[in-house]
């Protein structure tokens, strides 16, 4: 029983420390499209180098997208967030 509790704590801390793609809007509907270079767009929560690589949200009036640094990660990641949110 003790080992199960330790395993659950380890998994919880791992998700908290490393983050999860859902933190970047992965649950918000987005368009998975092919880019002009033939590659697929990058999903929210995954590494990118510029905004043009990221998948766009289906509802562009409510949501915006981009490629930026997350507080918990050193690299840039794609994100989708609500335009009215102060966290965007």
From Swiss-Prot:
Localization annotation:
Secreted
Write down a Pfam family by its short name: Cys_Knot_tox
Question: What GO MF annotations does this protein's record show?
Answer: ion channel regulator activity; toxin activity
From which residue to which does any coiled coil extend? none
Q: What cellular component terms from Gene Ontology apply here?
A: extracellular region
Q: Which InterPro entries match?
A: Cys_Knot_tox
**Recorded superkingdom:** Eukaryota
Alphabetic keyword roster: Disulfide bond, Ion channel impairing toxin, Knottin, Neurotoxin, Secreted, Signal, Toxin
**Biological role stated in the UniProt entry:** Probable neurotoxin with ion channel impairing activity.
Q: Which family does it belong to?
A: Belongs to the neurotoxin 27 (Jztx-72) family. ICK-41 subfamily.
User: What domain comment accompanies this record?
Assistant: The presence of a 'disulfide through disulfide knot' structurally defines this protein as a knottin.
UniProt-recorded name of the protein: Toxin ICK-12
Which source organism does the UniProt entry give? Trittame loki
């Amino acid at each position: 029983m003790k080992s199960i509790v330790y395993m659950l704590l380890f998994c919880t801390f791992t998700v908290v420390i490393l983050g999860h793609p859902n933190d970047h809007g992965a649950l918000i509907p987005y368009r998975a499209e092919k880019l002009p270079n033939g590659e697929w767009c990058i999903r929210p929560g995954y590494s990118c180098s510029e905004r043009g690589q990221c998948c766009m949200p289906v509802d562009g009036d409510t949501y915006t997208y981009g490629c930026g640094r997350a507080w918990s990660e050193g690299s840039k990641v794609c994100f989708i967030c609500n335009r009215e949110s102060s966290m965007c």
